[in-house]
Each structure stands twice: as C-alpha cells, then as structure tokens.
C-alpha cells in the first residue's frame, strides 16, 4: 500500500493526480487545495472515470484538511500563485514562499516520513525553502524542474523539426529559471 498526496488542485496538480491514479502509481491519491470544493470535485470526476479508464486507485479530495493526507509516502507540492504574462519566476518568491512554509508545516505534521517533490515556482528557491523548513535530509526533498524542462525542450525540438516526438532526445541542465537553463 502506498499513498501520494498532491497539494494544489490547479492544472498541474490535478493533472498530476489524474495521471498517478490512472497509472495506479499508488493505492491512494489525495488531492488537497485551499479553494473550497475544488479538489473534491476534481477527484469525484476522476473516480467516476475509473470504470472507463480501468483503474482502482482510491482517490480523495480535501479542502485544507491535511488530516486526509496523513501517512503519505510522497507529497507533490504544486500550490502557489501562477506567473502572469511577462512575470519572472523570481517575482513569485514573496507570495509562494509563504504558501510553501504553510504547506511544509502541515506535510511534516501529518506525513513526517514523506518524500517531498516541489513543482511550484520559483522551483529552485522553493525546493531549498522546503528543505530548510522541513528539517528533512536533502535526499527527501526533490525539485522537479529538470524533467519538466527537458520534456518541454524535446517537444519544441519535435515541433521545430517536424520529427516524431518519440524520436527526439535531449535534456536541459541548470536551474529552473529564465536565464539558467542549458539545452543539450
């Protein structure tokens, strides 16, 4: 039995929860959000599609009830305000750092043994903040930027060259920021 919690029911968080449930990555997937009823509605949709998609993952939605996340093996944090057009990731630090601190406090309270994956922006800074705020060892806090950046890079390459996306290989190294990514 394994349990994964996704914090943040926006586009990234809901998609993440959906993919994990459909692929049966865990026996239980919990989606939690601050917005009343949002995660419950998304998980109800997911549950009702389970017969069509042929998966048996337990799916749970919760509004700010971190007790529902207790004993999670993995917690994926996608919560935070998104960038607006023309905004840099770094401009999100003030608001999203406060959100991250509150989330980490609840994650540690209810799932002190969890591995934490940070997907919120600015990802590098918030991953470091999660490490410091959690007190967990560094091998239990993961920033997800590199995989996402590499995937985006391969998509752009395929589109630019007209190649089949499954035949394109490439990766991005460096920080998940506007000036620190290096495509290879």
Question: What kind of region is each of these model predictions?
Answer:
Residues 73-76:
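N-terminal Rossmann-like NAD(P) cofactor-binding module of classical short-chain dehydrogenase/reductase
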Residues 154-184:
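Substrate/ligand-engaging "lid" and interaction regions
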Residues 13-14:
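N-terminal Rossmann-fold NAD(P) dinucleotide-binding loop
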